[in-house]
Amino acid sequence: MACGLVALEVQGNKMKIIFVRHGEPDYSMLDKLENPQLYSGFGRDLAPLTGKGRSLAKEVAKTVCFGKAEIIISSSVTRALETAHYIAVETGLDLFVEPFFHEWRPDLDGTNSDLTSVLVAHEYYLKHQGALSEDSPYRYETDLEMRHRFLRTLEKYKNYKTIIIVTHGMLMRQFVPDEKIDFCQVIECEIEI
């Protein structure tokens, strides 16, 4: 996997972030339950990786640019944690779990827990370029809120020069220009905090 560099315009100390999107998740065990709706919303975050997702995570763990990193920080969501585990085993780096590096929140009010509602919220999010429209039936997390959540949390790691962050595509897209980010894709960027 190649590590390309993206520069960001944020003020303060320079930090190199090696973003890794989590491996392919396996929601099938949740979907096959007698009451799958019991695992809607954040419940879906309990799903592990598929076999293919594990294989890809083990492969990406050998990425050369990881040798520059000082620590690994992972979203607390299972698919990211499992991916980060393989990177930690391969690199020997300490793994920190960060609950605020989670995926985009399609529901800030706790009202749209079914898949259809999440898809509608996502449609509005895309239609309004990450802003919350007045006509949206759901209050979802905006791009600005995601960026703020991430940067506020990143503050406590500001003494590190290079870190690996295993997280989610929509969060990564707040800081890198890639429209599509594949499972286990590695994107290196530099920011100032």
Positions of predicted regions on the chain:
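Acidic, low-complexity terminal tails and accessory targeting/binding regions
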Residues: V10-I17, V60-T63, F96-V118, N159, ...
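Active-site-proximal alpha-helix that buttresses catalytic centers in soluble enzyme cores
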Residues: K16-V97, Q185
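Cofactor-binding loop segments of dinucleotide-utilizing enzymes, especially the Rossmann-like FAD-
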Residues: H22, F100, H168
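Short, active-site-adjacent cap segments at secondary-structure transitions
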Residues: D26, A80-L81, W104, L171-R173
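Phosphate-handling substructures
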Residues: D26-L30, E34-P48, E90-R149
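Glycine-rich phosphate-binding loop signature in dinucleotide/nucleotide-binding domains
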Residues: C65-K68, Y157-K161
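His/acidic metal-ligating clusters that form di-metal
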Residues: R149-R152, Y157-K158, I165-M170
